């Protein structure tokens, strides 16, 4: 699906991709920025918990992934776009994101030329245009009071002052559309799957006790939960074009020392999900086991030693996700706030036996097919 993301950005954006990504790496990794993001994530999660637990008895059952999806979206909009986008456009931007998610992977993008106005293409074009209109309007509004926004910590305020990106404001809408895709799906999956894994009372109690005595960033078990969720449920595919021929050795038991040559120009897809479930690499590969990270705190580093990439929830090398710190921070804060505030119970018609399979249709880690109804209880 990542091959079709060019359908949701305006022409010319990818010519400036390197500048935009460089600005992102700098802008969201500053200490003050991460502290602000942590505050936003905690505030939004607290508001969400209040809403979930204050519903009337008949309305308490909610769709878990859908609820976490809107929560993460609100955090992303406040952190990356700013309070003005949040106050005026947060719901509309969410609806636009969902429409784009539903249409970006259409088979028609593959079998028809890019200029053919088929249904999914038209819907993507309309969404792209509306996002651009929102950004054009909000940036004009900011120009009226530049001093008010100069010291803000949202990412747009940074890019407007960064010499590498200040002159590229016409591409901000496209840039943030891609960021919504990149930051949203996998963060939602991380939080939601951790919450579903609460079915182990021992793990839930252990996390609560640890959070009661440790600062969030010093909680080994919370860190282990995030790492194991990234291993067990990671599904984003890394797609690359081979720039030159490359010969690789393949480990096929029936063909010793077998090799394969990848021709120049070949599209190569790497599956973190299959890598993370390889029994030759991981003990109990198909079992969700956060304790593995407590038994060996250096496990992530060891898995990628010697040029081997066996743990890649955020990619690797020059293609490693620049938003890794932000995504982990949001996931940890959301989980910590929820686990310290309420319990999670099955909702109407849902149980462990009714859970569907994994939904790999999104850009990022898989969600649960059909979602699941849950109740957040004080």
From Swiss-Prot:
GO terms for molecular function: heme binding; iron ion binding; monooxygenase activity; oxidoreductase activity, acting on paired donors, with incorporation or reduction of molecular oxygen. Gene3D superfamilies: Cytochrome P450. Its cofactor is heme. Induction: Expression is positively regulated by the cluster-specific transcription factor pytR. Disulfide bonds: none annotated. It comes from the Eukaryota. Pathway: Secondary metabolite biosynthesis. It is an enzyme of class 1 (oxidoreductase). Keywords: Heme, Iron, Metal-binding, Monooxygenase, Oxidoreductase. Its EC number is 1.14.14.-. The keyword Oxidoreductase applies. Disruption phenotype: Abolishes the production of most pyranterreones, but accumulates high amounts of pyranterreone 5. The keyword Iron applies. Heme binds at residue 321. Cytochrome P450 monooxygenase pytD; part of the gene cluster that mediates the biosynthesis of pyranterreones, a family of antioxidative compounds. The first step of pyranonigrins biosynthesis is performed by the hybrid PKS-NRPS synthetase pytA that condenses 4 malonyl-CoA units ato the acetyl starter unit by the modular PKS of pytA. The acyl chain is then connected to an L-serine through the amide bond by the modular NRPS of pytA. A tetramic acid is formed and released from the PKS-NRPS pytA to give pyranterreone 5 with the help of the thioesterase pytI. Belongs to the cytochrome P450 family. This is Cytochrome P450 monooxygenase pytD. It comes from Aspergillus terreus (strain NIH 2624 / FGSC A1156).
């Amino acid at each position: 699906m990542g091959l079709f993301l060019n359908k949701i950005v305006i022409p010319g954006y990818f010519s400036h991709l390197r500048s935009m990504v460089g600005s992102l790496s700098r802008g969201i990794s500053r200490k003050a920025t991460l502290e602000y993001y942590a505050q936003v994530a905690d505030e939004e999660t607290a508001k969400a918990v209040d809403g979930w637990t204050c519903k009337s008895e008949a309305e308490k059952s909610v769709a878990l992934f859908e609820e976490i999806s809107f929560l993460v979206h609100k955090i992303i909009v406040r952190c990356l776009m700013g309070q003005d986008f949040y106050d005026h456009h947060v719901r509309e931007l969410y609806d636009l994101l969902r429409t784009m998610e539903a249409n970006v992977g259409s088979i028609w993008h593959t079998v028809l030329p890019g200029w053919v106005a088929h249904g999914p293409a038209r819907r993507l074009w309309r969404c792209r245009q509306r996002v651009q209109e929102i950004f054009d309007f909000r940036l004009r509004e900011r120009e009226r009071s530049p001093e008010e926004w100069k010291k803000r910590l949202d990412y747009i305020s940074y890019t407007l002052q960064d010499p590498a990106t200040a002159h590229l404001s016409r591409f901000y809408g496209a840039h943030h559309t891609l960021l919504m895709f990149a930051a949203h799906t996998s963060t939602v999956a991380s939080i939601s799957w951790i919450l579903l894994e609460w079915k182990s009372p021992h793990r839930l109690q252990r996390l609560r006790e640890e959070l009661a005595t440790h600062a969030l960033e010093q909680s080994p078990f919370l860190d282990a939960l995030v790492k194991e969720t990234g291993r067990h449920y990671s599904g984003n595919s890394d797609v690359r074009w081979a720039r030159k021929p490359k010969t690789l050795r393949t480990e096929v038991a029936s063909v010793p020392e077998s090799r394969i040559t990848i021709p120049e120009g070949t599209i190569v897809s790497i599956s973190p999900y299959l890598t993370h479930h390889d029994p030759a690499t991981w003990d109990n590969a198909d079992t969700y086991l956060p304790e593995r990270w407590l038994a060996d705190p250096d496990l992530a580093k060891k898995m990628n030693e010697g040029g081997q990439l066996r743990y890649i929830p955020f990619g690797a090398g020059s293609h490693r996700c620049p938003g890794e710190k932000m995504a982990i921070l949001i996931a940890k804060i959301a989980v910590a706030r929820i686990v310290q505030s309420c319990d999670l119970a099955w909702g109407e018609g849902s149980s462990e036996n009714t859970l569907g399979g994994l939904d790999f249709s999104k850009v990022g880690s898989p969600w649960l097919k059909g979602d699941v109804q849950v109740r957040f209880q004080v």
